[in-house]
Amino acid sequence: MERMEKKIYEFTNDGNSCVIYDAKPPRYWFNYLWNENGYCAQVSQNGHGRSYYLNERADMCMINNNDARYFYIRDDEMNKSWNIGAAPLNEQVESYQCEHSIGFSRLQSECQGIESSWRIFVPQTGFQEVWTFRLRNKSD
C-alpha cells in the first residue's frame, strides 16, 4: 500500500501565491513585503518576523528585531488560548494555512469553532505594516 504524504505547501494555479498547510515545516518560510520608501517586513508562516528599513545604499536599519508579531485568542468557556499561526503557544488547531503572496501574507486557522484570519501587508509608501484581523464564531 502506498503511503499518503501530507502536503506541506503548494503554489496557486496563477503562481502568485505559495500556500503553506503545515504550521511547523522543517524550516521557516518567509515572505518579504516592502515598499518604495525602503520599509521591509519579514513574515514567517507563523506571522513572526523582523521589520527594517533599507536606505538607497542598501544599509539596513532594524526597526523590530524581536520577531514578535503575534495575536492571542482565548475562549474563556473552554479555558483555552491559541494563536492563528500556532506560535508561540503551539496549541493544536483544527485547520491551518498561510498564504504568502505578492504584496501580502495571510494566516488562517480554526480552533474551538472559531475561524480566524490575519492579513499583513506594507502600504506602497510610509514606514508601517497594516494588519487586518477577522474572527468568526461558527459554534452555537
Each language-model region and where it sits:
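Anionic coordination/interaction segments
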Residues: 1-140
